[in-house]
Regions:
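Post-cleavage N-terminal segment of exported redox proteins
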Residues: 1-50, 164-169, 190-201
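Electron-transfer interface patches adjacent to heme c in soluble/periplasmic c-type cytochromes
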Residues: 15-24, 82-186, 200
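Short, solvent-exposed loop/turn and secondary-structure capping segments
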Residues: 27-34, 71-73, 78-83, 137-138, ...
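Short, well-ordered alpha-helical packing segments
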Residues: 29, 55-58, 111, 123
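Sequence context of c-type cytochrome heme-c attachment sites
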Residues: 34-46, 52-55, 71, 87-93, ...
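Electrostatic cytochrome c docking/interface patches
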Residues: 38-62, 74-81, 106-108, 176-179, ...
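The canonical Cys-X-X-Cys-His
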Residues: 57, 63-72, 189, 193
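Bilobed periplasmic-binding protein/Venus flytrap-like ligand-binding cleft at the lobe interface
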Residues: 61, 125-129, 191-196
């Protein structure tokens, strides 16, 4: 007599047991390999950790709330890729802690803004956006060119990021304060904006 599915379907406890075995096996096949990966997302070619000045700029970007109006994630939609460039992939964000994807766009997406405009354009735009884009509702940030970067805080910041997997070397950490000493917050923010999206064009 051949084995048929009818024997399983008519014995509810056997069917429940077999369902649990299949689910457990499927779960193991999906989950166990992740224990052997250092990271579930690998960096794409060309993605590097931010320099100390860029990292200081990222901190200013977060402090000033830029993420409330600008996203940093291009969705795989034709209209977005035509306007902003290639859609974002997970491997571009492996060194972002926390990532700056955003969920609202009052202003344009900034993920591929690096190299699109000159440093001077950014300087003028951050000083007073309406000088370059008359219809802009972005606030001006004139104080950024007067304030200097908190250089002494940077080594601890790099050490903290290294603890969560960003590959900063001991030399980079030791020289972090000197790398940004005397730089303005405007210089740092521009350096950060110019670094966005360069790994994938």
């Amino acid at each position: 007599m051949a084995f048929t599915h009818e024997k399983i379907e008519t014995k509810s406890w056997l069917m429940i047991a077999l369902i649990l075995v299949v689910i457990a096996f499927g779960g193991l096949v999906e989950i166990v390999p992740l224990f052997f990966q250092r990271s579930t997302t690998q960096a794409i070619e060309g993605v590097k950790p931010l320099t100390v000045l860029q990292l200081a700029g990222r901190d200013i970007y977060v402090r000033e709330g830029c993420y409330n109006c600008h996203s940093q994630m291009i969705r795989p939609l034709r209209a977005e890729t035509l306007r902003y460039g290639p859609y974002s992939v997970a491997g571009e964000f492996v060194f972002d802690h926390p990532f700056q994807w955003g969920s609202k766009r009052t202003g344009p997406d900034l993920h591929r803004v690096g190299g699109r405009y000159s440093d001077e354009w950014h300087r003028l735009h951050l000083r007073n956006p309406r000088d370059l884009v008359p219809e802009s509702n972005m606030p001006a940030y004139p104080w950024l060119e007067k304030a200097t970067v908190a250089a002494d805080a940077m080594p601890a910041h790099l050490r903290a990021l290294r603890r969560v997997g960003v590959p900063y070397s001991d030399d980079e950490i030791a020289g972090a304060a000197d790398a940004v000493r005397g730089k303005t917050e405007l210089d740092a923010l521009i350096a950060y904006l110019q670094s966005l999206g360069l790994a994938r064009k």
